[in-house]
Structures are given as structure tokens and as C-alpha cells.
A protein has these predicted regions:
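Short flexible coil/turn linkers enriched for glycine and charged/polar residues
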Residues: 8-10, 54, 86-89, 117, ...
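Helix-rich effector regions associated with P-loop NTPase G domains
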Residues: 12, 37-54, 65-84, 120-121, ...
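Conserved beta-strand/loop subsegment of P-loop NTPase cores
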Residues: 88-95, 118-128, 150-156
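Histidine-anchored nucleotide/phosphate-binding helix
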Residues: 105-120
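Canonical P-loop GTPase G-domain recognition
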Residues: 130-184
Length: 303
């Protein structure tokens, strides 16, 4: 029996890295039937045990418990959740300053998911070479807000060697994930960080500035500098899953202390009297964009 990490999932076959070789493996039907609430019983990053067949292929026997993972609502009319990647040291939401435009709501949903599932998170703002007047001030303000609540923010451009070297130092010997919409440059960054992986780079539609999907399946890519990066399919929206409305504020670090002062245990932090979170917001201790993101998320959970 062999033990390894899942590097790629195409739906029916899984590439498993044992450290000595990569084995194309299948998953028995019982695993697919056991977890009906999950669209993918195995995800990239999973640690598995497998038996090797005479033809060199593998059969996955056991899926080890995950240390952490990133999940989102299933798409295309499917119910339940879709797990993007597991067993991470860190995960980064990638956005571009322009083409497509930065989406702070997406960032906040990603950060809430990371808080809920125990993943260290950070933010990468790409395509800074496209920044126009006012963009740099916007980014500086954003960096200040997110750093103050514990999230590192990195700015980069594939044209800026210094910023790429900084990312290399962050990814070195770590298992990391890149999550973001299509077109923000996730794959382009990976190509510069590790030129051995000449991954297909997608063009951004000039008519809509919304990226075309280029990475079809999630994959965990070994880096020349050591470690792995999970390159995931572009995601237009990041839907929360398995988070109750009453617990949402627990995943906003800046709300944890103020909520202790709330008069009511069931406080939603929107309209109740004696709310510590509302008081903190009105006193300027909580960023308005973050607070409004919280309200939008709460409303989506109540729908």
C-alpha cells in the first residue's frame, strides 16, 4: 500500500504523488455515494492511501482526515458544497486592480471561509502595472484596513521582478492556494514564479473584461523553489457554505471583541439596541466596506 497527496482531480482520475512517483488512480464508487452533500469526495491536497495495480494505476482505499480546506457552494444547479483544496499552509485570494476590476465582496467572502475552516489567508492584488490615478491611494487604504485585522496584502505585476521575488519567498516550501476569478492573472503569476510550468494563459474578453476560464480542473503544482501551489479554476462568485447567520460575525476578526458587549445573545449587529459591533462601527473602529460586506453576507445566508 502507498500513501500520497492528490495533485490533480479531473473528476474520474486522480494524480497522486507518493514522493517517488505519480500514480494515476481511481476512486471506488462507495466513496462517491457516501458524501452526497459534497460534489467531490476527493479534492486536490488530500492525503490518501492506495493500492497499485499490475498496470501501474492505483485504487484509492482511504482518505485521511483533512487539517483544513477551502469550500464553496456547488455551482451549475448542484446542491451542497464543492471543496476546492485541502491541507493548506496558506491561501491567497487573487484580484486584479483592473481588467477585471477588483471585487472586495469576493475578497471578504473568501476571508470568512478561511476563518471558518482554519486556513491562514492573505490577499494578492495583481496587474498593478494597469493602475490609474487614484488606484494607488485606494490600494494603500485597503492594505491598511486588512493588515490591521491580520491579513497580509501583497501587490504585484508580472512586469515587476521585485514583487515576484517577494511572492517566491512567501510560497517557498509551503502548500499554498490561489483563489480568484478568471482573468486576474493567477496562471500568469505562476508562469513567472516557475517558468518550467508553461501553463495555458487565458485572455480576458475585451468586451466584458471578465476572464475566460482557462484552468478547467484544480491542480497542485510542485514549485522549483520547493512547496506546492494549488491553481484552481476561475471563480466568478464565492458562495458561503455551512455557515449559520448567528456565527458569521465570529469570522470577522474586528467584530470578535465588540460583539462581547452586545446586550442580546442573538444580536445580528444590524439594528439591535445595545450592540457592541454597531457602536464600534459608528466609532470608526470597523471599516465601512467590511461592515457592509457583513450585512450583504448575512442577508444572503437568510435567503
Amino acid at each position: 500500500m502507498e500513501k500520497g497527496r492528490v495533485l490533480e482531480s479531473t473528476g474520474s482520475w486522480y494524480k497522486v504523488d507518493t514522493g517517488e512517483k505519480i500514480i494515476n488512480s481511481r476512486l471506488p464508487g462507495k466513496f462517491r455515494l457516501d458524501k452526497k452533500e459534497v460534489t467531490n469526495p476527493i479534492t486536490v491536497g488530500d492525503i490518501v492511501d492506495l493500492e497499485v495495480n499490475d498496470d501501474g494505476s492505483g485504487n484509492i482505499l482511504t482518505i485521511h482526515d483533512r487539517e483544513n480546506y477551502i469550500t464553496r457552494q456547488a455551482t451549475h444547479g448542484k446542491r451542497g458544497e464543492h471543496i476546492l483544496v485541502s491541507n493548506l499552509d496558506q491561501a491567497f485570494v487573487v484580484q486584479s486592480i483592473r481588467k477585471p476590476k477588483l471585487n472586495e465582496g469576493f475578497i471578504n467572502r473568501f476571508l470568512v471561509t478561511c476563518e471558518a475552516y482554519d486556513v491562514s489567508a492573505g490577499i494578492i492584488i495583481n496587474k498593478m502595472d494597469l493602475a490609474k490615478k487614484g488606484d494607488h491611494d485606494f490600494v494603500e487604504d485597503m492594505i491598511e484596513v486588512y493588515k490591521s485585522i491580520g491579513y497580509p496584502v501583497y501587490t504585484c505585476s508580472i512586469e515587476d521582478e521585485e514583487s515576484i521575488e517577494q511572492l517566491k519567498s512567501i510560497f517557498k516550501d509551503k502548500i499554498s492556494a490561489f483563489i480568484g476569478p478568471s482573468g486576474v492573472g493567477k496562471t500568469s503569476i505562476l508562469n513567472v514564479i516557475d517558468p518550467d510550468y508553461n501553463l495555458k494563459v487565458g485572455e480576458v474578453s475585451s468586451s466584458s473584461n471578465k476572464g475566460k476560464h482557462t484552468t478547467t480542473f484544480a491542480r497542485l503544482i510542485p514549485l522549483e523553489i520547493g512547496g506546492f501551489v494549488a491553481d484552481t479554476p476561475g471563480i466568478r462568485e464565492f458562495g458561503l457554505v455551512n455557515i449559520e447567520d448567528w456565527e458569521l460575525s465570529l469570522y470577522f476578526p474586528e467584530m470578535i471583541e465588540p460583539r462581547e458587549a452586545c446586550k442580546f445573545n442573538t444580536c445580528t449587529h444590524i439594528h439591535e439596541p445595545g450592540c457592541g459591533v454597531i457602536a464600534a462601527f459608528e466609532n470608526g473602529e470597523i471599516d465601512p466596506n467590511r461592515y457592509h460586506s457583513y450585512i450583504n453576507m448575512l442577508e444572503s445566508l437568510e435567503d
